[in-house]
């Protein structure tokens, strides 16, 4: 039923807003001009103004065989090897955003290096996509859908360091953070209300108290 509704919406969108389909030979150019580096079949359908999935997949297969596009995951395609791996990580399972150790390490909260990309999503899973290991960490739906402390950069959703700090404590009761000096504690307590979790509130107050006592 959901698939039928999606196909109906796609046909409606195309017929209403995308009557001017690209001319033959311009299909690849349209993808290459897009700001996206990773495409789903649905993305391509909208860009091409094409509602027939068979036509889309056949055309994509032709470009892949010719070496003009790269298939990075089932149903996901990239312009070339220089695609944004974080964009890919958030396109495999949605909704999702980059967070946890990926953000904590980049922001100097944790010093340990991780090769995995850590992503908050609706399931726990570790996969490998085109050589990149990606760890998905399950979050409660109400938390996952709340965008407080989430920034969008080049089409990719990223947790702020304060959100990543709270997310990690939300799923891991005890955790060692190397450097809490970089956190904005006003933002931490602002985002904390998203979780509606008494255990987390007590834990954060404990970390804050210990932080203050060491200053």
Which functions belong to the PLM regions below?
Residues 10-95:
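Short beta-edge/loop segments at beta->alpha junctions of small alpha/beta modules
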Residues 1-18, 213-215:
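Intrinsically disordered, low-complexity and often Lys/Arg-enriched segments
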Residues 12, 78-215:
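Nucleic-acid-binding surface
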């Amino acid at each position: 039923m959901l698939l039928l509704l999606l196909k109906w919406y796609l046909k409606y969108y195309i017929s209403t807003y995308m009557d001017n389909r690209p001319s033959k030979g311009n299909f690849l150019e349209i993808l290459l001009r897009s700001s996206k580096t990773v495409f789903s079949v649905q993305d391509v359908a909208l860009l091409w103004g094409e509602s027939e999935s068979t036509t889309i997949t056949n055309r994509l297969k032709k470009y892949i065989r010719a070496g003009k596009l790269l298939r990075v995951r089932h149903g996901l395609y990239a312009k070339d090897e220089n695609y944004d791996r974080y964009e890919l990580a958030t396109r495999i399972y949605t909704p999702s955003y980059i967070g946890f150790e990926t953000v904590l390490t980049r922001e100097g909260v944790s010093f340990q290096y991780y090769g995995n990309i850590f992503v908050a999503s609706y399931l726990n899973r570790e996969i490998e996509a085109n050589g990149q290991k990606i760890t998905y960490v399950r979050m409660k739906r109400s938390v996952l859908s709340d965008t407080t402390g989430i920034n969008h950069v080049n089409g990719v959703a990223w947790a702020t360091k304060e959100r990543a700090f709270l997310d990690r404590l939300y799923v891991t009761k005890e955790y060692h953070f190397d450097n809490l000096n970089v956190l904005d504690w006003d933002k931490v307590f602002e985002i904390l209300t998203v979780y509606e979790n008494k255990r987390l509130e007590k834990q954060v107050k404990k970390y804050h108290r210990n932080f203050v006592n060491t200053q």
